[in-house]
Amino acid sequence: MKDYKNYIFDLYGTLVEIHTEEGEDELWKKLSFFYGFYGAVYEPEELQESYLALVASEKNSYAHEAYPEIELEYVFQKLFEKKGVQADMELAVHAGQFFRILSMEYVKLYDGVKEMLELLHKKGKKVYLLSNAQEIFTTYELRYLGLIPYFDDIFISSSCQCKKPDIKFYKMLLEKHQLKIEDCVMIGNDNTTDIAGAKELGMDSLYIHSNLSPELTGEPDSTYYMEEMDMKKLMEML
């Protein structure tokens, strides 16, 4: 593998293993309690249907974007407003985080992640995160996992209102830090987002087929390819 100056990582399925279940009846029952505590009384099924409808509406408002990304905190705020409750953004964020915690079975680092990131820093490399994710979830999960200090900068799609494979998302990082494409490599577990965007931009990439990767038909469109998650092997490549 070529020696790069800048290493750009995806998060979920690449550095972090996570499992969430958003369709469980118990989740919506408990979330309806949360909203009811603040005067926004929902039946669980009504709350779920309202949430899904608002998510669809928010996505439609960004229909001019090729790969739009919404900010979910506004959905959780509108769920209060729909019941006549004026909720500030702090309460909306807390509602969203409660939803996330209820949905989460686990979130953890793949073995060896911190050692791998430390190795890159010891070699004088820059390390960036480029994640299709929600700010109100991911920033706190990064803090919980102790990952924030390992990145030179973090880009989360909901804050940028676009997501991979949109090359605009990659360019935000490149332009902010004045990086040359040839000095960068994108590392991710999704051929249709992480790798596709890098390829369109002309950036080298490493595809890792992890347990969270979407089904892959044929060979990935990446410069390099790992058939399974193996942080020790990755460290040897770097």
Region spans (language model):
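Short glycine-rich His-centered loop
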Residues: 8, 16-17, 53-58
